[in-house]
């Protein structure tokens, strides 16, 4: 599969090792070391141990051997030793080390790529669809599950959400949904950090995805040298496919902590998820709680010495690394089953041990190949998809297909996307004439009734190219196939809405490059998750808005006291005091009225301005109502259709807005109108009664259908633009994007940059809705008639008269007046209590 190139971590080309029938036999684990050794995890191991010299090989083992036997059971099966019964040794006494382990690397949620054009799968769209259907009458149904007959699962292809006919009951979306097993990170004594099962894990379960930075060959070589210069001995490289590697040395997931074992309970598998190839660690058998998660590294050393193995298994070979893709000892069970040699390998002990070197395929072990039997078809098809970088393995698998003459097996191979697999072989390995010839000879035996599979798999393209080959035999077979396929008729099938068309756009939007990830991680560094700095913002006090209160003017200062005159008679003096009091009260009343008049005079210009400003608005409303009254039936129908168009257009624009940056603005408006017009025609045809509704609206169900149609429509547009080279590259991160053409945003940024203040702008969601509304008006035009009709429903607009002006609040009462009567004083003194 792939190769982990690391002192103790695997490359991916041949990460297939171990026997599914064997059970682990781990010796007791020593007590964990002290936490002071935490920086010594995966400590350097001693140098490589030279394997013992190979035993002499008989001449008969070097001769190619084939057999026409129908049974795949080896004659040596009777000599196969029965496996010992033993119980796996648990490591549940080891301490967990989540925090310490996470200090050694930077966690990633998913793989990031050096470029977006690497890490892509070579599968055709025809291979992405399975045949599983959910049966609601079967309570034990497990569509696309480990025990089902799902083609996708057999070929290590994940079903597409929304495309699989099992719907929400599909059990083959583990990578997309991140359905990882329950494991703990622990600190071992000799192997550094490791993974431990926190509960019982069934077979064929995804433990964790192998996550890291996907780099090209040149960068991989450069990093190997860089890490060596930095003194890093244990690299975490895994080969994804030819000239592409996953580097989890400094950035990745906890899958990097799974340790090596010569008798592992897990294996690494290469899966197709959408448009990408992804690696996952899967259980080979049931793993009990407390057992360590291990798999066979099969290290290609790339100039580094092999490491000492500490797995402690009875079949331990003593070292990690130095293995090749054809080494029987580390070959995955999938390839052994596909070649039909599992029993023979087990019986003869070809996997090797510390005392015995393992055999090499086609060097010191040439297997007897037999025609494919029914139970081997899925294994052979899956092994072909996994062997694109292993020409020796591919040649052996194609030999088995070529020697199979059973028509039932041919039909099963075609059902397992045989033509699409041959398309991959002829495009990826076109330089190997032996492999090309075997593929053409195999397909020449496959009989068809219709040519639909030929069209879906696109196999005719590479075969036509081979018809011009200089090799006469290859050229003749290619022409023979093309002539045969041309006689077949194409069967018509009812097309259905496919989610596969959206894979390219979804991959473009969901894939992140290393450069983009570095920008985001700089903005969201680990110490930025918590606010540790206090920000002081000075806010000016805000007075409550109240109406002005009339305050009486202070009284004039009292005049100087006159010269006291002799008192008059008592009767005239009392009358004079009463008269003075009456005069003083009258003057106070006059002053209060004058103050109230001044306040009213101050407020009157504002009221007049408000009344004068509302008059044009009232005239405009009256004009709209008159226009509404004199509209013809054709104009009314046109108006309602315009409303429906804008109502649907708002949902369309909102759905397409996600991909707005991937095309020109005018192009976006053009396709938004076309999509809306299509939906309006459908709605008018399905629901002619929309004209009877005064204020039409869309239900949630109808909005969901519009969004789904718009998404598929947009993806087709993006694919069309991409083919014409008019597709724009979206910005790396919307959060880091600045729109210099938006005056509102520029003004906001310039204002906020001066001094800290309380934000008065609307929320992000409100701003986005405002922009969507402006974009809808820009595309479909503003609808004044809709606003007019909505206003007609308000109580204020039920008659032709405007609403009465608001009455200002009454002037607050004057404060009480206390009058002090002074004898022989012509003018009294008044005091205002506040």
From Swiss-Prot:
Residues covered by region (Disordered): 1-83, 531-568, 601-638, 680-703, 720-818
Ranges of biased composition (kind: Pro residues): 25-34, 551-563, 802-816
Residue ranges, compositional bias (Basic residues): 720-729
Compositional bias segments (type: Basic and acidic residues): 692-703
Domain AWS stretches: 125-179
Acidic residues composition-biased segments: 775-795
Keyword Transferase: yes
Role noted for this protein: Histone methyltransferase that trimethylates histone H3 'Lys-36' forming H3K36me3. Involved in transcription elongation as well as in transcription repression.
Domain comment (free text): The AWS and SET domains are necessary for transcription repression.
Protein name: Histone-lysine N-methyltransferase, H3 lysine-36 specific
Source organism (scientific name): Cryptococcus neoformans var. neoformans serotype D (strain B-3501A) (Filobasidiella neoformans)
